[in-house]
Amino acid sequence: MSWISPELIEILLTILKAVVILLVVVTCGAFMSFGERRLLGLFQNRYGPNRVGWGGSLQLVADMIKMFFKEDWIPKFSDRVIFTLAPMIAFTSLLLAFAIVPVSPGWVVADLNIGILFFLMMAGLAVYAVLFAGWSSNNKYSLLGAMRASAQTLSYEVFLGLSLMGVVAQAGSFNMTDIVNSQAHVWNVIPQFFGFITFAIAGVAVCHRHPFDQPEAEQELADGYHIEYSGMKFGLFFVGEYIGIVTISALMVTLFFGGWQGPLLPPFIWFALKTAFFMMMFILIRASLPRPRYDRVMSFGWKICLPLTLINLLVTAAVILWQAQ
């Protein structure tokens, strides 16, 4: 057929790749919620969800059906438009942040030359969703949770971005594929160890995960900025949080652990195994660490993480200049 051109086929293949990758990310985020509950039960010497299906294997399906049929309630005195937009912005921004991650050679949704900057932009956009949710709910606990979340996220995004500048300086590019290719001989985690530590800490904080989950602290704020959400709106926030974990784990692999590179196994398998390891670390951290006070979280970021990232960046720049001479 004359209307089928090579350009059209290329566009269709690109769309197909994007749909497949993003569907896999959403599925991984959903299944991680079930896996986390089972593993937390194991860590805490209890069973966890094991009633629906064999060994609880259909628990996720039951939760999805329950959430889909729950009443989608909107508070009487809330700002209905902003209240509805907030979970959509949160889910979309966190999902789009994964678009620049190459899962194997040639398999990336958007191979941008400003890949890292695009990720930081999407992470910053998620802050607006939190503020919208807290403000539009017209609830004091929701507003306090949103203020905590926005201050914490904006603070730790500074350290998140600075921790990546050493990687960018070594690779000479913001493109994620170029960064993976630059690790053919040595993974960035070795020369950029302190950058990796800071990125991991800031990544946990940006995802609002334990022990940095003060914006959602049940004992203090009754679930924080999404206290008034129910049904599918709450589901978008809930799944979006786990998509954020998948994205941060994938970025750790891509930026510091060679991405898809590895012996014997296919590239995608290596990428999936490395990412699954860091997703498991998120769950282990939640099971083992206590929640510190909010002021100590902020103090830790500005007094320890910020100097560490600046020292790492200065040392990296000095080494690059010394090698160039």
Curated annotation (Swiss-Prot):
One Pfam family, short name: NADHdh
Localization annotation: Cell inner membrane
GO MF, one annotated term: oxidoreductase activity, acting on NAD(P)H, quinone or similar compound as acceptor
Record-level GO cellular component terms: plasma membrane
Keywords: Cell inner membrane, Cell membrane, Membrane, NAD, Quinone, Translocase, Transmembrane, Transmembrane helix, Ubiquinone
Coiled coil: none
Subunit structure: NDH-1 is composed of 13 different subunits. Subunits NuoA, H, J, K, L, M, N constitute the membrane sector of the complex.
Biological function: NDH-1 shuttles electrons from NADH, via FMN and iron-sulfur (Fe-S) centers, to quinones in the respiratory chain. The immediate electron acceptor for the enzyme in this species is believed to be ubiquinone. Couples the redox reaction to proton translocation (for every two electrons transferred, four hydrogen ions are translocated across the cytoplasmic membrane), and thus conserves the redox energy in a proton gradient. This subunit may bind ubiquinone.
The protein, known as: NADH-quinone oxidoreductase subunit H
Gene label: nuoH
